[in-house]
C-alpha cells in the first residue's frame, strides 16, 4: 500500500514544532557530517530556530571564516569591505555630531565666540535664556516638593500633639490619676530607679497656695517623697 503524500506546512502546535525542529536538525547535521567525511566536502550550516536560538555545523577540516572567504572569492563579492564602509560612514557622522556638541558647550561657556555672526549670537542668547528658564522652573518644582513634604510632616506632628493632649485631658478627669499605689509598693511610684528620689503627683484644690502650682494655673502638682 503506497504511503500518502505528507503536506508540508507550518506546524501550529508549538511543542510539536520544537520537537520536529530538533529531530530534523539533528538529522540534517548528521547528513552534513556524512557528506563532509565521505566526499571530503567543506560544509557549513547555520540555523536559527523560531525561539531565536542559534545552531550551526561546520566541517571539522575548516572554519567558518575560511568558508566565508572562499565563498566571497568564488562569487566575486566582498562582504567585509561593504560592512566596513558602512561602519566608517556611521563613525564619520558620530564624530561630526560630537564636534558640534563640543562647540556648543564651549559657546555656552563664553568660549569660541569670535567666529559667530550677529544672528548666531542672538540665537545663542535665546537658547541660553530658554535653558535658564527651564532650570528655574525645575528649581521651583524641587522647592515646592520640599515645602509640601515639610508641611505634611508638620501636620503629622500637630496631629500627634492633639492626640496626646486629648489623652492627657481624658486622664485628668480620672480622680485616681496621678497617684500610683500598686498595693502599697511605693517603689513603683514615678521616680528614678535604684533608690533615687521618688515623685508623687497629687491633685490640689484650685485655691491652694500659689507657690505649689506647677505653672499655668494647673491643679496638678508633684512632690518628692522623702525616705
From Swiss-Prot:
Transmembrane segments: none annotated. Residues 3-57 form the MADS-box domain. It is found in: Nucleus. Keywords: Activator, Developmental protein, DNA-binding, Nucleus, Transcription, Transcription regulation. SUPFAM superfamilies: SRF-like. One of its GO terms (biological process) is positive regulation of transcription by RNA polymerase II. GO terms for cellular component: nucleus. Residues 84-174 form the K-box domain. One of its GO terms (molecular function) is RNA polymerase II transcription regulatory region sequence-specific DNA binding. InterPro entries: MADS-box/MEF2_TF (IPR050142), MEF2-like_N (IPR033896), TF_Kbox (IPR002487), TF_MADSbox (IPR002100), TF_MADSbox_sf (IPR036879). Mutations in defA cause transformation of petals into sepals and stamina into carpels. Transcription factor involved in the genetic control of flower development. Acts in conjunction with GLOBOSA (glo). This is Floral homeotic protein DEFICIENS. It comes from Antirrhinum majus. The gene is DEFA.
